[in-house]
Amino acid sequence: MTQMIRTLRPLTLIAALALSSAAFAGGTHAGGHGHDSEETAIGKPGMASKASRTVTIEMTDNLRYTPADIQVKQGETVRFIVKNMGQVKHELSLGTQQELLEHLEQMRKFPDMEHDEPSKVTLAPGKQGEIIWQFTKAGTVNFACLMPGHYEAGMKGQVKVNKK
C-alpha cells in the first residue's frame, strides 16, 4: 500500500500541473499584445472623464459596421459605444493591420476566446459595450470583427487620425 501511494503522488502532481496549464492556455488573450495602460502603435486606453465625444458604432449580421469610417484628431480621446444589432456574436477590435491579422489567427484557433483588453469588445446579440481610446499618433487605426468568417466577409473599418 505504501509503495502504491509513493507511485501515485508524483502522477497526481503531474496530472494537476497538466490540467492547470491547459486551463491557462485558453483564457483571455490579453497577455502578449501590450494593450494595457501603456501606449501602443495605435494609441492607449483613455479615461472616460477625458473623452471629448462619443461615437456610436452598430454591428449587424450583414457583417458591416455603421459607421465604418471615422475621423478623429491626434490626441483626442473618444468613447465608442458599440452595439450588436444582430442575432450572432460580434466584436470590435482596434489595431494595426498586422495586429488584427495576428489576432485573426488566434481567433481561428480559439473562437470562443473572451477579450480582456481595453482595445476590444465582444458582444452577444442585442448587447452593447464601450471602448474608450486615446489616439496619440496620426495615421490610420483599423478595426474589425475577428469572429470566424466575419473579417473575410468585410466586417472592418478605419479610424483616420488627423494631425493636430
What is each of the regions a protein language model found here?
Residues G86-K89:
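Extended, low-complexity, turn-rich repeat/linker tracts enriched in Gly/Pro/Ser/Thr and Asp/Glu
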Residues M47-T77:
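N-terminal edge beta-strand
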Residues G26-H33, R64, E117-K164:
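Extracellular/periplasmic metallocenter environments
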Residues T2-T12:
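Bacterial N-terminal signal peptides that target proteins for export
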Residues G26-E58, E99-M113, H150-K164:
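Extracytoplasmic/periplasmic copper-protein system
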Residues E91-G95:
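Beta-strand signatures of extracellular beta-sandwich domains
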Residues S20-A22:
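N-terminal signal peptide c-region/cleavage motif recognized by signal peptidases
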Residues V82-N84:
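Asparagine-centered strand-capping/turn motif at beta-strand->loop junctions
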